[in-house]
């Protein structure tokens, strides 16, 4: 077991370790929060001894889908607010994202290898963290009186079965999809061009290869090219589902592109291939019927991922179909798309307000297995689980964040606000927050027209950050 420092909290008393199962986004963040609070942690990760269908490394917090954490705007966007709340709460994931950041307009995107390496190095170097490699193939032993299960969308079959038997509830499953990655130098820039939608610049100090406001590579399509592409998507050979994967619903936030196309021929043109906010410098007077965007995937700018192009097409079909896109005729793929299954528990039915299993409170769940959707949301639930477990170990009552914060709104959703009979994965959004009081404008009137929506969003976010600071303050004072 790792040696740990004597702190004001522990005085000279030994503190039993908390066991964290899974070193993904949630588990890594939970372990960090515990260790930073002065609580020893045993972090269990089955990779590389037991592999998954989606992971490629044995690193912690490996990103297996997109490399984007979505919008970083903490004034007008709910996930951007969640970023900021996590930063203020001392998040390791947000620290790593700042180090590994790559250009992505107003989004927070990272070099996935640099990100994972940073998280792995920080945790393995922490004196209060012990890493144990190997599968936990059943429920945690009875002498683990405080354990966090953060095994994510690819929970091993053995552990998943044990959880199902314990909860007595049917697990739900769906698929997250992986988008292809293209080598930058194989893209024909005489056809494509660099531009962020509406020329929006990166939120940080980074800029894409094309310069400020030019973080994406855009591939234009005529109507004829778009319709031919849709036909190719619909008729292309797909990887067959295994028997245990059949009848599994998809989550709308990560639908395979061919599934979107099946919903109607115009669906993609009003989704990831929408042509708005972009002007082709090669033909400025010609409006594209549809546009495919590629986003920088690594710090060097040598890899670009196809935005929204998660797919279950067979690999040979992917190269054939995607090379019909103008500018990608000679594209070389660093990685082709694929799908992996995701499982989650019925959290509103099973968990208490501090994420413990009501039936067996020594077990706490965190991350995507709780039914949150997205890297940041998973990490956020890991942050809370770690803080709650640390409070218990240090003899304090866990304090939940205010529901007016992004952390609190998401937590409340999965631990009771959502309808357990129809519970489905959820991203953070302002619809989870209590409605705010929108301040009057300089004329003493309620904002109207175009000013109404941003004023309301700022009311959400300003209230959230003020309430977050009040929630964080007692812990900061206790640490002094």
From Swiss-Prot:
SUPFAM superfamilies: FAD/NAD(P)-binding domain
Keywords: Cytoplasm, FAD, Flavoprotein, Methyltransferase, NAD, NADP, Transferase, tRNA processing
Residues reported in the UniProt entry to bind FAD: 22-27
Compartmental location: Cytoplasm
Signal peptide boundaries: none
One Pfam family named in its UniProt record: GIDA
Region (Disordered): 438-458
UniProt family annotation: Belongs to the MnmG family. TrmFO subfamily.
NCBIfam families: gid_trmFO (TIGR00137), PRK05335.1 (NF003739)
Function: Catalyzes the folate-dependent formation of 5-methyl-uridine at position 54 (M-5-U54) in all tRNAs.
Protein name stated in the entry: Methylenetetrahydrofolate--tRNA-(uracil-5-)-methyltransferase TrmFO
Natural source organism: Parvibaculum lavamentivorans (strain DS-1 / DSM 13023 / NCIMB 13966)
Lineage: Bacteria, Pseudomonadati, Pseudomonadota, Alphaproteobacteria, Hyphomicrobiales
